[in-house]
């Protein structure tokens, strides 16, 4: 999710103070000392250039941690350093978990990718009869996004959110174009609830997070006491400000409302090399660019919950996220079995730039 009122970034003149030394590095595989030093220097330089208070970096190879390290501070006011256990908000990196949950239900025969949405939403507009689950997963359904008038501080009910989505006309005929839509994934979360009887976050907790021992990963709650939770920030006219929170319900939707750490994401990454959660055929389908009705690949290019690209000859599935003073990115070079994750606590930061450059350094160090 990326509502504009929470992402606006003015050209900064204020330099955020952050700890000069990185903390708690975990190194479980051999790596070139030169690459290690170069990555450290690059990350610190980018943090200073982008004015990022804190960053958590994961590099994994063959499903094993190469580097799990914190830089800077998780809380500026208290000067709490970032460490591998520090918990950040996911933003839209959470969409891959939603897509995985839907594919679990597909494998169990409870959901069909070609099913029309009206199978699950009986009171939906007639136009939804032409929209399939597959099209929601790939952002080709014609769904829009949060309108500018959306009140993020109203504590919506799930029913109210669904009625809001249903009331917005489709932007194009389903399956004919690609347009990124948070509302599409929000609707998938409600679909999961209707099919299983379990709230989206509870389904993820039981079927994914518990299965993989992702003990710090969960739905966002500002009310709960969350050990190791980072604070989110934004820059306003060059001055660092605390992020202002949204209503509780808006922090529980399936378009990207999770807490996690890089250590938990390392477990997630390792599981994607196995069939612990899904069959290989299901994962391959998620990581293949979905086709439009004319047989052409969509212009995302997007699969189910993942962007799919070629970067300098290397296949990369990836996603970034933006929400409430946090920016995140995960890049998985699946054929090279290399994964790089960067979690940051500044709205408008560019963690995807960092993950891509760090990956290039490791790919060059073969």
Question: How would you label these PLM feature ranges?
Answer:
Residues 78-82, 166-171, 243-252:
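Short glycine/proline-rich turn/loop motifs
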Residues 12-25:
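Bacterial N-terminal signal peptides
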Residues 26-30:
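Sec/Tat signal peptide C-region and signal peptidase I cleavage site
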Residues 31-69, 193-206, 210-211, 236-366:
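Catalytic loop of the DD-peptidase/beta-lactamase superfamily, centered on the K-T-G motif
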Residues 54, 84, 89-93, 105-148, ...:
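Active-site helix/loop module of the DD-peptidase/beta-lactamase fold
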Residues 40-43, 57, 63, 87-114, ...:
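Active-site SXXK
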Residues 32, 87-89, 120-124, 147-152, ...:
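Second-shell loop/turn segments in exported
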Residues 1-10:
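N-terminal secretory signal peptides that target proteins for export/translocation
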């Amino acid at each position: 999710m990326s509502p504009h009122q929470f992402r606006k970034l003015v050209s900064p003149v204020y330099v955020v103070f952050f700890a000069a030394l990185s903390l708690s590095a975990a190194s479980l595989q051999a790596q070139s000392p030169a690459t290690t030093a170069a990555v450290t220097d690059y990350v610190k330089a980018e943090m200073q250039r982008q004015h990022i208070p804190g960053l958590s970096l994961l590099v994994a190879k063959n499903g094993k941690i190469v580097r799990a390290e914190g830089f800077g501070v998780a809380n500026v006011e208290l000067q709490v350093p970032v460490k591998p256990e520090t918990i950040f908000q996911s933003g839209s990196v959470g969409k891959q978990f939603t897509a995985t949950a839907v594919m679990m239900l597909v494998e169990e025969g409870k959901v069909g990718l070609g099913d029309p949405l009206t199978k699950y939403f009986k009171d939906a507009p007639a136009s939804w009869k032409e929209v399939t689950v597959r099209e929601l997963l790939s952002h080709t359904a014609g769904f829009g996004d949060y309108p500018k008038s959306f009140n993020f501080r109203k504590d919506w009910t799930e029913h109210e959110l669904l009625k809001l989505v249903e009331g917005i006309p489709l932007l194009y005929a389903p399956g004919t174009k690609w347009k990124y839509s948070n509302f599409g994934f929000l609707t998938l979360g409600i679909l999961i609830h209707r099919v299983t009887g379990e709230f989206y976050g509870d389904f993820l907790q039981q079927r994914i997070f518990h299965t993989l021992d992702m003990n710090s990963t969960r739905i966002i709650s500002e009310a709960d006491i969350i050990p190791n939770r980072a604070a989110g920030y934004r820059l306003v006219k060059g001055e660092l400000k605390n992020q202002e929170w949204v209503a509780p319900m808006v922090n529980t939707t399936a378009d990207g409302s999770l807490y996690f750490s890089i250590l938990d994401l390392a477990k997630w990454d390792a599981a994607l090399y196995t069939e612990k959660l899904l069959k290989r055929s299901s994962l391959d389908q998620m990581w293949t660019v979905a086709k439009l009705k004319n047989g052409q690949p969509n212009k995302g290019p997007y699969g189910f919950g993942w962007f799919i690209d070629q970067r300098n000859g290397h296949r990369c599935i990836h996603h970034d996220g933006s929400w409430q003073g946090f920016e995140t990115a995960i890049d998985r070079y699946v054929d090279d079995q290399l994964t790089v994750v960067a979690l940051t606590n500044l709205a408008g930061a560019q963690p995807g730039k960092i993950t891509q450059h760090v990956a290039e350094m490791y790919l060059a160090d073969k």
